Amino acid sequence: MNNEKNFLSYMVFILVCLVVMICYSSGIITNISEKIEESSTLAVNANYKSNNLIDDMEKNSEKIIETIKSFNGEKAVSYYITNEIDDKVVYLTFDDGPSVNTRKILDILKKYDIKATFFVVGKEDDESIELYKEIINNGHTIGNHSYSHDYKYIYTSLENYSEDFLRLQRLLKEKCNYDIEIARFPGGSNNTVSDRYHKDIMVDLSKYLIESNVTYFDWNVDSTDANATTMSVDNIIREAIKGAKQFNSPIILMHDAPPKTTTVYALPCVIETLKKDGYEFRALSPDEYVIQFLRAKY
């Protein structure tokens, strides 16, 4: 009798254990099912969002007639292109001069028998006037980079910008008998610093230059020499060459302000490497290849 009771107790214990295990397993299965369903939902949502993003990009791209993209790290930038060319041509551009570095750059350009573009600021000392003249006499192009290069002043109003812009135009005309036909906005036409002083002013300033028959230029290659007061020579060489080789016609942003000594040291290597790669060098012209981040619409 005792054996029967013991057997029944044992069987009850086994049944209880089985029930507990089944319930526990059901919970796990349910949880796994929920996780799978959740993952599937996330995947569907991600695919939906991705498709919507592609649709949005396609819709947006229709608003830009001709664009190219440059990838600098994780940043993608769109450009408007005018007069695209098939030749392999490099356009070296130097902003913020003249300075002691400008003459050194002019000597290098003369050595390699190539032309470039200098987006200058306003300086009226004798040495700077001579440098303006030397740029012109050596067959390079001068562009207007604003007289003051004072973001707060020129980007506060159209009146301030135009006054500053025309001051430099007059200086070059009076001292060098030179008519400036091209320009580059400090920070580029898509700069966001200007919004601190006047929201969306770049549209008005772009229209102003167009109405003044002045072509403004941006760039599609950044040498990164402005990313530090004095960037390393190796970094300038690497970024300039790497960026240039992405394009048939790279417009390279460089600087010849007083601290940019390493730009001078990097320049020969950049020139020699791109020459070996089959590029020729030209100065910018309003009638030739133009790249703009922002294009004003009427």
Where are the regions that the model predicts?
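Hydrophobic alpha-helical membrane-insertion segments, chiefly the h-region
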Residues: C17-I28
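Short charge-dense sequence patches
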Residues: L53-D56, Y79-E84, Y112-E124, A183-V193, ...
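Catalytic domains of cell-wall/extracellular-matrix polysaccharide-remodeling enzymes
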Residues: H149-L253, A257-K275, Y279-E280, P286-D287, ...
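Active-site beta->alpha N-cap acidic-glycine motif
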Residues: N60-N160, R167-D179, T273, Y289
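N-terminal Sec-pathway targeting helices
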Residues: M1-L15
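N-terminal, intrinsically disordered, polar/charged segments of Gram-positive cell-envelope systems
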Residues: G27-D87
